[in-house]
Amino acid sequence: MGSEPFQKKNLGLQINSQESGTTRSTFHSLEDLGDDVINESWDQVNQKRANIDHDVFHEHPDSSPSLSAQKAKTKEEEVAVKSSNSQSRDPSPDTQAHIPYTYFSKDQRLIIFGIIIFIGFLGPMSGNIYIPALPLLQREYDVSATTINATVSVFMAVFSVGPLFWGALADFGGRKFLYMVSLSLMLIVNILLAAVPVNIAALFVLRIFQAFASSSVISLGAGTVTDVVPPKHRGKAIAYFMMGPNMGPIIAPIVAGLILMKGNYWRWLFGFTSIMTGIALILVTALLPETLRCIVGNGDPKWGDKKDERENNESPFFEGNKISHRRLFPDIGIRKPVNNDAFFQENFPKPPKAGLTLYWKMIKCPPIIITSVSTALLFSSYYAFSVTFSYYLEHDYRFTMLEIGAAYVCPGVAMLLGSQSGGHLSDYLRSRWIKSHPKKKFPAEFRLLLNLIGILLTICGTIGYGWAIFFHYHFVVLLVFSALTAFGMTWCSNTSMTYLTELFPKRAAGTVAVSSFFRNVGAAISSAIILQLCNAMGIGWCFTGLGLCSSISLIGILYLLIFQRKYTAKEF
């Protein structure tokens, strides 16, 4: 049996329709289908087919079939459409039976999300658990405060550049293998940090490798979310994933305080991160499947069947919602695409290998650079607040270390609320737009409308925080403005990340890596110079200037909302 009958019967590749007396073949790739046509009922499909004079899956178009042949053909057509109805997309009355976006069951997606959220927590935790121990490490290593603080600057610098490397490979070579490589490197480095003798040069080198290994988590995680979650739910999916990275700066100082409160146990900071990293590596190796779409498609194991085996199956993919016979330790090692058929490659194309040229093209792309710089400015304002908050609480408000740590809970909770509410509202507005504009492709830039609100909240919080400290307002006022700054920043970060992954789905990890690069560079510069600027300008005017800088983000987002459609969102 050849491949053509298999494609016509089971996959619905060729759909012939009568149009102006001619027969045409219509093909829609998976990435081109709109969400307004998903989950259409069987009655609606039958009604559309009744009103259209076309012959689906017609084996002999020139013949005049008998009545019995027509009945058999109709029955075969109904079986083909029903088998894909619950999970398919129907972009036009001419087309039926399309591939579901993902084959992974709900339970398996919960496992995937649990793992990537936990891994996402490890990266920021590795950087932030170290900061409360800086005075202690300064004494242990017998160096100046400037030298020991430089280990933080080096970490942030490498943490900014690292995602460019991981993001480039993640969109080409697979997610799971890179997770295993980065976690293995992180585990080795953390063990060495906990065990090597005191030597400042060794500390610098190991912190560089620690930052490089831990910098993979956000770009790989965002890519994984794009693999398994369709665009209509991606806003809240990104919000759930970002719970991990957002919790890192909140929990890490608390853990560090608990470890250090009983004495000189700073090595256990790295011991704790080693244990957490080891657990993550085991989870990834044992439970996480490969999800990169150009390798495994939508996750259906039948893509890997031989052609003759697939042809003998009544339904080539997606029979129900469960995945049977899933095994432990799946997809270990470097993976090749499970299928080389033209149909698979058309729907799940492999992007070209990444390099410096690719990133240069991304940086020159207005939607990417504007969104990345906008997020970086907001992130810089937040880090300026984060660095100065503890300093002024200790010197101006006479807070203890325990009280300072508790004060950070307020902006931390605001970060989580901003990410979650922004993600859910983004998806809700997207679904409303699709319902009011049937049969039209959703403009991804529509999500950025929410950024206007988040930017204004961040500007108000930033300026208000500076003047509240300048006039020595009550501590509760500081908490309110800090919450506004944190809420607005994560609100915008979530929406921007969702926008980039929807605009460039095949380069999700790469575009998020570029955005992370600008964001972390901004945070590193801001945290390094903010105290000097506050001393020179006064904290009120300094944070007013930061708020005005954030207004540049407002201009950039407005530009994209107005002129986005003049740019063609081509995959790189």
From Swiss-Prot:
Extracellular side: 132-149, 206-207, 262-267, 388-398, 470-472, 542
Region ranges (Required for the localization to the prospore membrane): 548-572
Gene induction: During sporulation.
Protein's UniProt keywords contain Ubl conjugation: no
Composition bias, Basic and acidic residues: 50-62
Region annotated Disordered, chain positions: 1-28, 49-95
TM stretches of this protein: 111-131, 150-170, 185-205, 208-228, 241-261, 268-288, 367-387, 399-419, 447-469, 473-493, 521-541, 543-563
Gene Ontology CC entries for this record: cell periphery; plasma membrane; prospore membrane
BP-aspect Gene Ontology terms: amine transport; ascospore wall assembly; transmembrane transport
Membrane topology of this protein: Multi-pass membrane protein
Protein's cellular compartments: Prospore membrane
Alphabetized UniProt keyword annotations: Membrane, Phosphoprotein, Sporulation, Transmembrane, Transmembrane helix, Transport
Changes after translation: Phosphorylated.
Main location: membrane
Gene3D superfamilies in the cross-refs: MFS general substrate transporter like domains (1.20.1250.20)
Cytoplasmic side: 1-110, 171-184, 229-240, 289-366, 420-446, 494-520, 564-572
A single GO molecular function term of this UniProt record: amine transmembrane transporter activity
Pfam families (UniProt xref): MFS_1
Residue ranges with Polar residues bias: 13-28, 83-95
Family: Belongs to the major facilitator superfamily. CAR1 family.
Function noted in UniProt: Prospore-specific dityrosine transporter responsible for translocation of dityrosine through the prospore membrane and required for the formation of the outermost layer of the spore.
Name of protein: Dityrosine transporter 1
Species in which this protein is naturally found: Saccharomyces cerevisiae (strain ATCC 204508 / S288c)
